[in-house]
Structures are given as structure tokens and as C-alpha cells.
């Protein structure tokens, strides 16, 4: 209902998806891609994309990368296709990796938007003749970058937490021998280090 109220002109008007044509334009208003048309072709290609996503003979991360590309290429809706593709990809990655890595992938894609769009352009180029290698390698690099960043961040925060916890246990004024007090102090410490907003009471 909220989507219907806020953006009624971009609602799907076909049986499942959009029924009319849609163009993807550059900031200079130049058409760089046309979404699949008509809706019957959209449905057919989405079914094919889902078949690839569920094909367990293909490594999982490659399936996710291919589906992400197919969704963007098909462009089943009038608007919000990129956001939906990132959401689906983040969800799929969270199932098999970790939610922190999945969210970081989405952040990186948004941060390096030109690099991301170039992956689609290179894959769509006539010279590649449908070769999905650029989008697969590019997506895997985003995942690798997100994984390394998340690992580095968590490692640094954990080391900070361990040092702070050691300092806390050596503070005479705190009754850390009391289990309840120690547990509360530990929760507050974790919130201060691992959360951007700390903790509220």
C-alpha cells in the first residue's frame, strides 16, 4: 500500500510485471539499454533466470552473479530494478555467507556505481556476444572486497573489545566479580565497540 501511494505511476501494470517498454538512460539522457519486451518475454526470461539460480551444478556465487545480471538486463519493472536486484543479491549472499558481508556488497555497488554499470556495459557489448564472464568476475570481486573489508573491520573491533574488556576487569571501582554487573558491563562494552549507535536504556 505504501508503494502504491508513493509511486503509483510505476506500478506493474501487466499480469505480473510491466506491460509497456522501458528505457534505461544515462545522465545525458542517452538510451543505454532497453528492457525486455513484451511481458510474455519478461516472464519467459525470468523463469530462465530462476532456473539458473536454482541449478546446483553451477557454483552458488556464480549463480547469484548471473541472476543479478539477468534481473538488471530484463528490467521487469518500470522503476526500482537496481534496488530490487541489490536487495535480492544481498539476501542470497546473507543465506550462504554472512549478513554483514551481504550488506557491504550492496554498499560497495552503490559507492562504485560507475564500475558497477561498466560491468553491465561490457557484458552487453556486441563484441562479447553474450559472454557473462565480465559480470561474473566483477561481481565476485565485489564479494571478495566486501569479505576482506568485513573481516578486517571485525578483527580490529574484536581486538579493541578484548583490550577494553581486560582494562575493565582490572578496574578496582567496578564490581566485576558480581556476575550481573559484569554481564551488564560486557554488553555495554560490546555495544560501544560493535554498534554505531551504542546502546540505550
Where are the language model's segments positioned?
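FIC/Doc superfamily catalytic core
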Residues: 1-201
Amino acid at each position: 500500500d505504501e508503494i502504491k501511494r508513493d509511486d503509483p505511476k510505476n506500478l506493474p501494470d501487466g499480469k505480473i510485471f510491466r506491460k509497456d517498454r522501458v528505457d534505461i538512460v544515462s545522465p545525458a539522457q542517452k538510451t543505454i539499454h532497453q528492457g525486455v519486451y513484451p511481458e510474455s518475454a519478461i516472464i519467459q526470461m525470468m523463469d530462465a533466470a530462476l532456473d539458473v539460480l536454482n541449478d546446483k551444478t553451477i557454483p552458488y556465487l556464480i549463480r547469484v552473479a548471473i541472476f543479478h545480471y539477468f534481473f538488471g538486463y530484463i528490467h521487469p519493472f518500470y522503476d526500482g530494478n537496481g534496488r530490487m536486484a541489490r536487495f535480492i543479491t544481498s539476501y542470497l549472499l546473507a543465506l550462504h555467507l554472512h549478513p554483514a558481508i551481504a550488506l557491504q556488497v550492496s554498499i560497495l555497488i552503490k559507492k562504485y556505481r560507475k564500475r558497477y554499470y561498466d560491468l553491465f556495459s561490457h557484458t552487453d557489448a556486441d563484441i562479447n556476444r553474450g559472454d557473462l564472464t565480465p559480470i561474473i568476475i566483477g561481481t565476485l570481486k565485489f564479494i571478495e572486497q566486501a569479505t576482506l573489508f568485513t573481516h578486517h573491520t571485525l578483527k580490529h573491533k574484536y581486538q579493541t573489545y578484548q583490550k577494553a574488556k581486560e582494562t575493565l576487569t582490572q578496574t578496582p571501582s567496578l564490581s566485576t566479580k558480581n556476575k550481573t554487573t559484569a554481564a551488564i558491563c560486557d554488553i555495554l562494552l560490546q555495544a560501544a565497540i560493535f554498534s554505531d549507535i551504542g546502546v540505550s536504556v
